[in-house]
């Protein structure tokens, strides 16, 4: 089991190996072990004769070991540190950080730093291989995997969502919890963005170049990205090293949603772009001269009609205002005549009253005269 895990972890994500650089592998394949356990480090270089001399370094200092294998028996805290190796004329290996722990439960990982697409192996390991059951694996404090009986866990293709702090818990005589261990997954390349050489909508007949744009964030010998182009569910072009696709003569049937994929050669890392909408319009025929003549003639007639209507309406409004004024004046004169007639009637009534009073006085005088004569 350990041999298969080691072999799986040793193969790089892109299938390419720098044959001039040494690589350290571990047996068992864990970068953290308990005290008193045994671990062996192997210095490997492809296509290098086995008789080449080997140099080991611990925390930057050369050690006494000159064999391709560096064996640590009954590990102690003093064996913790950064290991590198070099064989013959090869380049010095990348560092391996080995940690020696004390405790009852230990979460073991195959490495602390990964490139996305590489496998991550985890093991919830008890002191002296004691029986552990009801095992839970956690990432950033949240349980994500449960085993009734203890079992190793492998994430075959890591991505940046697997960044975080991992720990495990399990039942023995009691419920035990391991310390946390930080795991970093480096992004190999960002998700691509699909761009077009012309803006949408566009006219039929145009040349359109689609570009699937991304870039490698980590450089490795022989690492190459492959690109595919799609319209909806239709494949326009399969895997190819060119990041461009051309529509030589755009037609209306080329309208649709386009997207692309970028992937490593082995397909371990594959990322899709957001969709890009292209709208192709039919060609517009040139407008004939007679149409322009008719158009401007119609506009002129409409302007003339509007002008005549405006003048007519204005005259009508003026005439109506004058007529309303005359009616108003006539109403005022009529009121004055009525008022004058009412005054004349009042005077006539007063004169009649006065005449009646005078007549009554005269009658009174005539009645008194005969009485005096007697």
Curated annotation (Swiss-Prot):
A molecular function (GO) term: IgG binding
Principal location class: membrane
Keywords: Cell membrane, Disulfide bond, Glycoprotein, IgG-binding protein, Immunity, Immunoglobulin domain, Innate immunity, Membrane, Phosphoprotein, Receptor, Repeat, Signal, Transmembrane, Transmembrane helix
UniProt region (Interaction with EPB41L2), positions on chain: 312-332
Organism superkingdom: Eukaryota
Subcellular location: Cell membrane
Ig-like C2-type domain mapped to chain residues: 22-101, 95-184, 190-277
Region (Disordered): 352-374
Tissues with expression: Monocyte/macrophage specific.
Positions glycosylated per UniProt: 59, 78, 152, 159, 163, 195, 240
Pfam families cross-referenced by the UniProt entry: ig, Ig_2, Ig_3
GO biological process, one term: positive regulation of type IIa hypersensitivity
InterPro entries cross-referenced by the UniProt entry: Ig-like_dom, Ig-like_dom_sf, Ig-like_fold, Ig_Fc_receptor, Ig_sub, Ig_sub2, Immunoglobulin_dom
Modification after translation: Phosphorylated on serine residues.
Membrane topology: Single-pass type I membrane protein
Membrane-side (Extracellular) residue stretches: 16-292
Signal peptide residue numbers: 1-15
Transmembrane segments: 293-313
Similarity comment: Belongs to the immunoglobulin superfamily. FCGR1 family.
Complex formation: Interacts with IGHG1. Interacts with FCERG1; forms a functional signaling complex. Interacts with FLNA; prevents FCGR1A degradation. Interacts with EPB41L2, LAT and PPL. Interacts with HCK and LYN.
Protein name, entry field: High affinity immunoglobulin gamma Fc receptor I
The species this protein was found in: Homo sapiens (Human)
Gene, per the UniProt record: FCGR1A
């Amino acid at each position: 089991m350990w041999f298969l895990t080691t072999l799986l972890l040793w193969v790089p994500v892109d299938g390419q190996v720098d044959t001039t650089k040494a690589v350290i592998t571990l047996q068992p394949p864990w970068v953290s072990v308990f005290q008193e356990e045994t671990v062996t480090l192997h210095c490997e270089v492809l296509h290098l004769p086995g008789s080449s001399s080997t140099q080991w370094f611990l925390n930057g200092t050369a050690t006494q070991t000159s064999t391709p294998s560096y064996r640590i028996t009954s590990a102690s805290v003093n064996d913790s540190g950064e290991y590198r190796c070099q064989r013959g004329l090869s380049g010095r290996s990348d560092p391996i950080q080995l940690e020696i722990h004390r405790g009852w439960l230990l979460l073991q990982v195959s490495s602390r730093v990964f490139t996305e697409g590489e496998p991550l192996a985890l093991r919830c390991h008890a002191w002296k291989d004691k029986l552990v059951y009801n095992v839970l694996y956690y990432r950033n404090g949240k349980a994500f995997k449960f085993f009734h009986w203890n079992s190793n866990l492998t994430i075959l293709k890591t991505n940046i969502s697997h960044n975080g702090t991992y720990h495990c818990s399990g039942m023995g005589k009691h419920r035990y919890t391991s310390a946390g261990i930080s795991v970093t997954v480096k992004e190999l390349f960002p998700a691509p963005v699909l761009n077009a050489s012309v803006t949408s909508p566009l006219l039929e007949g145009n040349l359109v170049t689609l570009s699937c744009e991304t870039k490698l964030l980590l450089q490795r010998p022989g690492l190459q990205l492959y690109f595919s182009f799609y319209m909806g569910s239709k494949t326009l072009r399969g895997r190819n090293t060119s990041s461009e696709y051309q529509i030589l003569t755009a037609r209306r049937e080329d309208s649709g949603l386009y997207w692309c994929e970028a992937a490593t050669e082995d397909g371990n890392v594959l990322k899709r772009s957001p969709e890009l909408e292209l709208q192709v319009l039919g060609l517009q025929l040139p407008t004939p001269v007679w149409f322009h003549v008719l158009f401007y003639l119609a506009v002129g007639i409409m302007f003339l009609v509007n002008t005549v209507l405006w003048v007519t309406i204005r005259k009508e409004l003026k005439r109506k205002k004058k007529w309303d004024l005359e009616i108003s004046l006539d109403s005022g004169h009529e009121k004055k005549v009525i008022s004058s007639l009412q005054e004349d009637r009042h005077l006539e009534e007063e004169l009649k009253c006065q005449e009646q009073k005078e007549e009554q006085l005269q009658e009174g005088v005539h009645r008194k005269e005969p009485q005096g004569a007697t």
